[in-house]
Design a protein with these regions (language model features):
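Short phosphate-binding loop-to-helix
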Residues: 1-14
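Short beta-strand-to-loop acidic/aromatic patch adjacent to the donor-nucleotide binding site
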Residues: 11-23
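Acidic-glycine-rich active-site phosphate/pyrophosphate-binding loop
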Residues: 14, 59-71, 111-112, 164-180
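Generic enzyme active-site microenvironment
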Residues: 19, 49, 163
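Conserved core of the sugar-phosphate nucleotidyltransferase
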Residues: 26-124
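Conserved active-site beta-strand element of glycosyltransferases/polysaccharide synthases
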Residues: 121-126, 131-134
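N-terminal extracellular/periplasmic Venus flytrap/periplasmic-binding protein-like
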Residues: 143-159, 163-182
Length: 183
């Protein structure tokens, strides 16, 4: 809120604020341009997001066990309308000021705060490589994406070369056996 509040003194109420998590360093220029091109026409703002592709299960904790990993499937959700929110997320200064004005928050992102006042931010197709790095495994995945972008195969020190080989035919006959076939 402090950043948005600061901007009210130097920005127009119609200016856009683009909020981005530092833990998502793999956002591409293409995704940013898509967000801006589509999102800047949306009065309720917009966010990058990707559709859920895995089967989505609603878990139910086993209350008899005192173990947070003891979770069972309550039901399988229809993933058709579920998306995974990403950043950047973009909103007009005025909208975010209205949302944050004098409230205490328990929101996980700006979009959910905007939703809380009845607005409907637009979902803009993001990219899977725009991963949120919160675990060591996430960091490895992000590094692999970066290596792929640079044209390097992760974990391999590969070199490609070209050569040739010349041999004299023996006196036994004028043929060669290649792949088990007499030529």
């Amino acid at each position: 809120y402090a950043g948005v509040n600061f901007l009210k003194n130097i920005a127009s109420m119609n200016d856009w604020i683009v909020v981005h998590d530092a833990v998502r360093p793999c956002v591409s220029q293409i995704a940013l341009e898509r967000l801006w091109d589509i999102g800047s026409k949306e009065p309720d703002g917009a966010i990058l997001a990707i559709p859920v592709s895995d089967t989505l299960k609603l878990g139910l904790a086993d209350k008899e066990q005192n173990d947070p990993t003891s979770v069972y499937i309550k039901k399988t959700e229809n993933r058709e309308y579920y998306w995974l929110a990403q950043t950047p997320q973009m909103f007009k200064v005025e909208l975010l000021l209205d949302v944050f004005q004098g409230k205490t928050f328990s929101f996980t992102d700006e979009a959910s705060a905007v939703e809380s006042i009845g607005k409907k931010p637009r979902l803009i197709q993001g990219e899977r490589k725009n991963i949120k790095i919160t675990t060591p495994d996430d960091l490895k995945i992000a590094e692999n994406w970066q290596l792929k972008e640079e044209g390097v195969t992760a974990g391999h020190n590969m070199r490609i070369g070209q050569g040739f080989d010349v041999h004299k035919f023996g006196n036994e006959g004028k043929f060669v056996i290649l792949g088990g076939v007499k030529i």
